[in-house]
Amino acid sequence: MIQLFRVVISEQIIDNSEPVKCKRRTTLGKSLLFSRVLYREWWPATYCSRVSGYRDILPELDLVLWLIKADDRALSVDEYFWRHILQCGHQQVLFVVTQADKTEPCHEWDMAGIQPSPAQAQNIREKTEAVFRLFRPVHPVVAVSARTGWELDTLVSALMTALPDHAASPLMTRLQDELRTESVRSQAREQFTGAVDRIFDTAESVCIASVARTVLRAVRDTVVSVARAVWNWIFF
């Protein structure tokens, strides 16, 4: 079933509000996954028993993480929700195949090397491809094992890419230290400056006076450069 995670609520570029909210469903490994990825608690939301409850909250979300267990073969409810309830929000969804270490043959998982056996790797590949064929999402399907830590860095990279630029840096500050790599920090910084840059696009589009547009263009590069320079000070 669908899992909704509120990564950033506000449309502001800098936001320290509740970073993550979840719509509950048991046995998917949500708690373990997020405790391995985030160093702060995530806030579980109340269960939505009505379709309208999901529809009401979707516009508030920057990203939806849709969790599917690696050994889950019954996806008819997920498919119905995707096609009939989610409607126009497909670009907000990142599919994650969880508990990859339980993929058959599960006894072959390499605990020392923290990786699947060749047979498991093939089955995981087939699972992610099957999920992609069924849902045709905008973003690639990611497979992870929260219990072993396998591919959590890939999940973080996918999250950063899928998030709107204004939401990447607030999420990055809440990652576990080992996942907040220089590459992730660099990506968040560039997305932050990109968000600042687009503010000028919006401002120019609503400016009627040519003088005002000229002034905006003159200060644009300076402001974006300053934003890049002070990024570390703002978020750390």
Swiss-Prot record:
Give the GO biological process terms.
tRNA methylation; tRNA wobble uridine modification
Extract the InterPro entries matched here: P-loop_NTPase (IPR027417)
The protein's superkingdom reads Bacteria
Q: Name one GO cellular component term.
A: cytosol
Assigned protein family: To E.coli YfjP and YkfA.
Q: What is this protein called?
A: Putative uncharacterized protein YeeP
